[in-house]
Amino acid sequence: MNKQHLALSLSVGVLGGISLILATAFTHYIVWVGFVAWGLFFKNGGDSAALKMGITAGIYGAILAGLFFVLSGAINIGGSLNGPIWIAITVFALIFGTQIPIFSCAPTAVCGYAVTAGYCIHAVDGAMIPMISTVAITNPVVSIAISIIIGSIFGMLSGKVAKAISG
């Protein structure tokens, strides 16, 4: 049995439970988005640079997805192809923008875009989509950003706890 793997499993398991408790108490933390960010923290290296990259690139992706909903709702540039055209434009901008060092992890930026789009599209009756353009904590992009930050921090904490447990 690998001692480090056991320690990480224990750490992530316990903190995962705490993460769910937090999500039930603070409704703007979306636990599944937090877990995506948590996993990306480790995929990006599991260190302070990964924490920074996970947060900045993930939120960048969330903002671009929010921009998709705002633009596609306000400006119809393609009739029945309006949505696909705006997806093409915003995803192009998303990937092109990963040349900027703080957004340079394209997979994390894409995940930020995807969780935002998924959250908005799959909300009951599309209830989140009209809220995209609001300046409030109820804006789905804000909730996703909060969740990315919290999930990334849980990733960092679980790594530190695992290291402390395994010695």
At which residue positions do the language-model features occur?
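Charged, low-complexity, helix/coiled-coil-prone segments
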Residues: 1-3, 13, 75-76
